[in-house]
């Protein structure tokens, strides 16, 4: 009785903490006044740093596929004279394609307002899609751990640990989806001045 009530409250508290963090991130995107360029730079830097740490870019095909999947469909091949062992050269190539895509969207969308609207939409979509999945995951986790009453572990501690791991994984996925939405989307402006976006 009392234990399971307390457990339910603890589970709810964990979800509330995550929800507040997500809403703070959404608010930052919605009400951010100083252009979104600084936010986009941060997201790109974090995503690319993580890729540099986790991926093996000493093989040209790995670098090519990474750029094609996450940064730009416009890449034909990795330049032959690129030194794949040189971190700076690899970074420069990735950033070159990333900013080329951002500039292409600016050209396509013409006005600053439309471009910012597209950027905001791209990033909010990444946050919202992943948060919906995370809520679903937390509910399943709650049921799974709640049904393990007989295990030796403290269910609340176990829930918090798994929920935290899930939250960290979600933050990484949000970053990745933001980058892909911003760079790989196809955008066009209708005659009425509306944006049509096809997200990857």
PLM segments and residue spans:
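Extended, charged helical/alpha-beta scaffold domains that provide interaction surfaces
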Residues: 1-200
């Amino acid at each position: 009785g009392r234990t399971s009530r307390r457990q339910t409250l603890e589970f709810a508290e964990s979800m509330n903490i995550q929800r507040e963090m997500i809403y703070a991130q959404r608010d930052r995107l919605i009400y951010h006044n100083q252009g979104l360029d600084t936010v986009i730079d941060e997201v790109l830097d974090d995503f690319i740093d993580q890729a540099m740490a986790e991926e093996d870019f000493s093989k040209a095909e790995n670098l090519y596929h990474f750029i094609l999947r996450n940064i730009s469909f416009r890449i034909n091949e990795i330049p032959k004279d690129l030194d794949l062992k040189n971190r700076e050269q690899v970074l420069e190539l990735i950033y070159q394609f990333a900013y080329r895509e951002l500039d292409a969207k600016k050209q396509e969308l013409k006005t600053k307002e439309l471009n910012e609207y597209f950027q905001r939409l791209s990033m909010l979509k990444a946050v919202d899609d992943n948060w919906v999945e995370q809520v679903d995951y937390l509910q399943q986790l709650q049921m799974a751990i709640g049904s393990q009453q007989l295990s030796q572990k403290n269910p609340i501690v176990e829930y918090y640990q798994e929920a935290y791991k899930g939250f960290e994984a979600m933050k990484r996925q949000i970053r990745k989806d933001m980058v892909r939405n911003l760079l790989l989307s196809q955008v066009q402006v209708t005659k009425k001045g509306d944006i049509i976006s096809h997200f990857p």
